[in-house]
């Protein structure tokens, strides 16, 4: 048993969460639609939001019942879950869907009953039905980018816990900030970012992801091809593992690069001292951006405006590197990824370890692990089992990740 008092960081909160794009393949499949109707015009509405574990949640009313939906700009359309169906949904065919790991499948499409968000009611809004990727979380569904694609300008301001929606094209004309044009691919927004040197890439603006920035493996290869040794200098570690969980399962086992970006440029604004890693899914600029400023999306101009809270041309991020991540393996919590320079590795955690017990409590499912009532500052005794079936114990103390 390793008996060392150290930091236990709850890392599930930084896993990339959802990316959905819809790719019709033939006449038998339904097509993407955003022609739902609105009950109001010439309006401005301020909606109170929840900002929890680095994501934006909206109160949505359907059939007189209030639901809690994630606002995910990386999702082309709304999503509801098979294990908690919403009454009144009408089948609308099948559609091809791609998740955060790049996996694709054909899923059921439905038309939702009238949906009310603030003072706005949407009629004819479509949603896909998915299995819940991580059970035990209080999420009833997803509102996707079609809300904005429909023509509504939006301002996300987590400091004031507000989402402002309007159909007035000039409502935000006097707002100041750093603006960038976005391009729609598969009905979701991509902006150009500069992670290092002369390399630039189109990156998904994805509030479904909790991270500030994640770089696809393919993008890093392209970056290395363009700037050579300068790209290699970004690497602060390598590991064989997986960390992203999508609706169709966890990503496959592969090499993950741990990166330290001195300067990530987006919206003509510099984010300095950024720790991140590579992913098998899309490169993305995620919801952690909202920690540093408000964001305005203007669909009629196809522009996204970033308003830094510090009112400066650059922001120092200075975040911690992800040192361990957990994924489901056979329904149980498993160490999907571990950084060899991190504290969990020093304590004895290894990739592939299965968590079987915390203190005296047997862990029987990934859901139980995700919802375990950890307390910051308390030490826990983890019992883990490796691939050979050998068990060992590790003491680990949870502290809040900066």
Regions from the PLM with identified roles:
Residues 1-31:
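Bacterial Sec-dependent N-terminal signal peptides
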Residues 25-402:
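Pepsin/retropepsin-fold aspartyl endopeptidases
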């Amino acid at each position: 048993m390793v008996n060392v008092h150290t930091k236990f960081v709850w890392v599930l909160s930084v896993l990339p969460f959802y990316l959905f794009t819809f790719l019709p393949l033939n006449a038998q499949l339904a097509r993407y639609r955003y022609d739902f109707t609105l009950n109001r015009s010439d309006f401005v509405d301020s909606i109170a939001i929840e900002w929890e574990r680095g994501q934006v949640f909206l109160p949505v009313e359907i059939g007189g019942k209030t639901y809690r939906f994630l606002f995910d700009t990386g999702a082309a359309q709304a999503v509801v879950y098979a294990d908690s169906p919403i009454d009144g949904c009408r089948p609308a065919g099948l559609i091809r869907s791609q998740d955060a790991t790049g996996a694709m499948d054909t899923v059921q499409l439905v038309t939702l009953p009238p949906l009310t968000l603030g003072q706005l009611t949407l009629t004819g809004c479509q949603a896909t039905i998915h299995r819940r990727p991580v059970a035990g979380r209080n999420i009833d569904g997803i509102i996707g980018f079609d809300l904005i694609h429909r023509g509504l300008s939006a301002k996300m301001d987590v400091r004031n816990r507000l989402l402002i929606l309007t159909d007035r094209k000039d409502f935000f004309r006097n707002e100041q900030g750093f603006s960038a044009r976005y391009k729609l691919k598969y009905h979701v927004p991509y902006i150009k970012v500069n992670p290092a040197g002369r390399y630039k890439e189109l990156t998904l603006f994805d509030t479904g992801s909790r991270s500030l920035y994640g770089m696809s493996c393919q993008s890093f290869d392209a970056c290395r091809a363009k700037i050579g040794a300068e790209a290699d200098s970004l690497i602060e570690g390598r590991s064989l593992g997986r960390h992203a969980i999508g609706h169709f399962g966890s990503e496959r086992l592969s090499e993950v690069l741990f990166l330290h970006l001195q300067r990530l440029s987006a919206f003509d604004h510099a984010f300095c001292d950024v720790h991140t890693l590579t992913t098998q899914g899309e490169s993305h600029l995620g919801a952690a951006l909202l920690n540093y400023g408000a964001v305005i999306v203007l669909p009629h101009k196809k522009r996204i405006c970033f308003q830094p809270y510090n009112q400066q041309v650059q922001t120092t991020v200075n975040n911690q590197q992800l040192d361990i991540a957990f994924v489901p393996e056979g329904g149980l919590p498993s160490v999907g990824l571990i950084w060899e320079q991190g504290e969990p590795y020093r304590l004895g955690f290894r990739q592939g370890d299965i968590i079987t017990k915390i203190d005296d409590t047997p862990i029987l499912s990934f859901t139980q692990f995700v919802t375990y009532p950890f307390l910051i500052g308390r030490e826990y005794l983890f019992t883990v089992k490796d691939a050979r079936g050998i068990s060992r114990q590790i003491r680990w103390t949870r502290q809040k990740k900066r």
